[in-house]
């Protein structure tokens, strides 16, 4: 069920089959949750045909949520369902609480996490932060939005992934490192930020990944990522159609920030939408308001 603070847990060679697991917060096929200052390691464990549902936050095929998490050689083919966008929060929560977040084929959410050589083939759905491997590492949205770091290596997803926003074939939203991983499932966001590998990241490094299926969003859709504000892409390939019903669609990224390096990437699929479309990137550049000093600096530079 839960790992207490300052406790180290290792789960190895365990499996759950043909069950139904329902809960409110941190619901997983193998482990529910790991609290702050806990460390969890799960290896060679599998969820087979078990349906996992969290009505509030963090549903995962292997683990619902863990503070510090290491997963190796695990798999899920059960159906994972996170909270719906219409789920109302309890009335006594602080104003800065986050809710209706996190659904993943392996992990719903985490603090610092590393997920290696794991795969998902089950359908994953939720509201915000939905991914084939991990859903969301969102920490807070007030006064600013912050994420924890996750690394995904040698992983794959073949299940369909859908939700409202921040939807990805491997990761919904996080500060992400991804290496030698791929997605074969259809990715769909009812609202914004959908990507074959990643929905959204303020910072990401994605190398040697591939997307093979369709990516659809109302806005911000990309064959690899819906949006990345800063980071690098190298040796990535998209072969899935990318569509935005409104704006920002690209073979690699729907919209990128001011600081991005991209090398040896390729797109072989059609891009469609109403505005800001690109074979590689829909648009590059952060939105900003020009101050008087910015104008003066530009004048002197000119």
Identify the role of each PLM range:
Residues 1-302:
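Predominantly extracellular beta-rich ligand-binding scaffolds that present long acidic/polar faces
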């Amino acid at each position: 069920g839960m790992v207490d603070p300052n406790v180290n847990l290792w789960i190895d060679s365990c499996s759950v089959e043909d069950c139904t697991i329902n809960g409110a917060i941190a619901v997983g096929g193998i482990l529910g949750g790991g609290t702050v200052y806990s460390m969890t390691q799960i290896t060679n464990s599998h969820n087979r045909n078990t349906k996992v549902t969290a009505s509030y936050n963090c549903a995962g095929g292997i683990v619902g949520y863990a503070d510090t998490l290491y997963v190796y050689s695990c798999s899920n083919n059960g159906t994972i369902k996170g909270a719906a966008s219409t789920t109302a929060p309890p009335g006594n929560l602080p104003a800065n609480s986050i809710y209706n977040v996190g659904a993943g084929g392996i992990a719903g959410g985490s603090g610092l996490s590393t997920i290696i050589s794991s795969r998902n083939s089950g359908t994953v759905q939720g509201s915000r932060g939905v991914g084939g491997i991990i859903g969301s590492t969102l920490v807070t949205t007030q006064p600013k939005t912050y994420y924890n770091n996750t690394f995904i290596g040698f992983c794959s997803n073949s299940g369909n992934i859908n939700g409202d926003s921040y939807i990805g074939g491997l990761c919904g939203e996080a500060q992400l490192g991804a290496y030698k991983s791929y997605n074969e499932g259809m990715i769909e966001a009812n609202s914004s930020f959908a990507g074959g590998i990643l929905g959204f990241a303020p910072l990401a490094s994605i190398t040697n990944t591939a997307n093979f299926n369709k990516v659809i969003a109302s806005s911000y859709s990309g064959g690899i990522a819906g949006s990345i504000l800063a980071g690098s892409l190298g040796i990535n390939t998209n072969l899935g159609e990318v569509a935005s019903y409104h704006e920002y669609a690209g073979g690699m990224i729907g919209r990128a920030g001011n600081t991005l390096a991209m090398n040896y990437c390729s797109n072989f699929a059609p891009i469609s939408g109403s505005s800001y479309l690109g074979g590689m990137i829909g648009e590059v550049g952060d939105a900003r308001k020009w101050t008087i000093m910015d104008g003066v600096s530009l004048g002197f530079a000119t």
